[in-house]
Amino acid sequence: NDLHEEVPALGYVLGDEGSGSYYGKFLLSSYLYNKLPKEISDSFDKKFGLSKDEIIDKVYKQPNPNVFIASFMPFIIDWKNNPFISDFIVNGLKHFLEVHVCCYQNYEKSSVHFVGSLSALLKEELDMAAKEMGIVINSIVQKPVGPLVDYHIKYILDKQLVN
């Protein structure tokens, strides 16, 4: 099958829907706007002890702000059963699916495959978002090395050995 790009990758500032930096931006802005539920805010304070000025400095003045922002994903995963975080996770995944899956013709007749830690860690939420949107997920692979080796053995090496 021929694939072609429908949606450009816009990076963590303009895009990156459903990524660690996408969710990290939400967490940090919610924290700085005092919108986090108290138990999450208190836990954030206890775990990180970051002031507004420190966060602003790391995001706007230090190198690799995307790495800093995405580094809060384990904290978000720890709180994913809280309705405030859970709702945002599911809505973020729906946004990802709208932008990167629904752009293809007949997407509802195809199945989608996901690779990576975040999709594996958010499997339940991803399944829920996809189901609500009529998207069929065929597989979620946390670490693709094993399946890649299997593919190469089955399709690439096999052909080379026959010829």
Label for each model-derived stretch:
Residues 1-39:
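Phosphate-binding/catalytic loop of phosphoryl-transfer enzymes
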Residues 28-163:
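ATP-binding/phosphotransfer module of carbohydrate and carboxylate kinases, centering on a glycine-rich
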